[in-house]
């Protein structure tokens, strides 16, 4: 079972090709994340073991969640707003940032590959690749 992360901004959409995920806590269940895409405004989302739910930015609990780095077995479910129709196999940019309690920021960048397109063609599933 892969983990789904749904990343939305205040307009309920986020362009995959410029997806950035940042958090001041370790990645883990209940962790508050922010998504920024170009000049679009950010919104807090949560990463859950299998699915996600929207949470406020103050809901992250430092020290009470297990560290979880983005790995190749994780799939991000995102709203695709690009001008080209998404298709399985399409490569998109993906970057993450993780700031630990020691205030050291750890960044992971790589490419995401669309592995599936939802029945709603604006929703795509992106698998992270280093």
What are these regions (language model features)?
Residues 1-130:
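Surface-exposed, low-hydrophobicity beta-strand/loop segments enriched in small/polar/acidic residues
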